[in-house]
Amino acid sequence: AACSLMKGSNDQQAREIKELIARNFLHPDTNNEFTGNKFFGDSDLTIHRTPHWMASVRMASDRVIGTELVNEDNLKGYYMADGAIYTYIRGDEYHNIFPFWDWRKIPGITAYESEAPVPAFFNYGAHVRNKTAFVGGVTDGETGMTAMVLDRDGLQAHKSWIFTRDYV
């Protein structure tokens, strides 16, 4: 998909795109060059990366559907965008965990304690979306703060995360 960016590019742009791909996509054993904090407003996602660890927070709002169900993959991902936070040091911390995960207790999410099956979301109706627009982040590029108001399934929570060089 990244190679499709080169269509219509001049020689200099094509070289830059190839270098970007080589640096960031072709060698999974090499480090990504990004360090700092970035909030992606169109996706309700925050990424915080230091030389020694990284974290990401996945959220949803009334304008962003928090999770997808495609080809019956992610059948239990209903709560994935209710503030799920992933922290990494090595990069393989979540390898093969999904068959054993309690999908109501994913780090960072807010959900009812229940033995009932995780709700199905075979369509993208209103029940899948967070009912509030209050999801956002501020950053100076190195540190940042992310916040959300969760209002879904009758459950409400005000949630925030502060990202620094040393901690979340």
Regions found by a protein language model. Give the residues of each.
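Extended polysaccharide-engagement surfaces of secreted carbohydrate-active enzymes
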Residues: 1-168
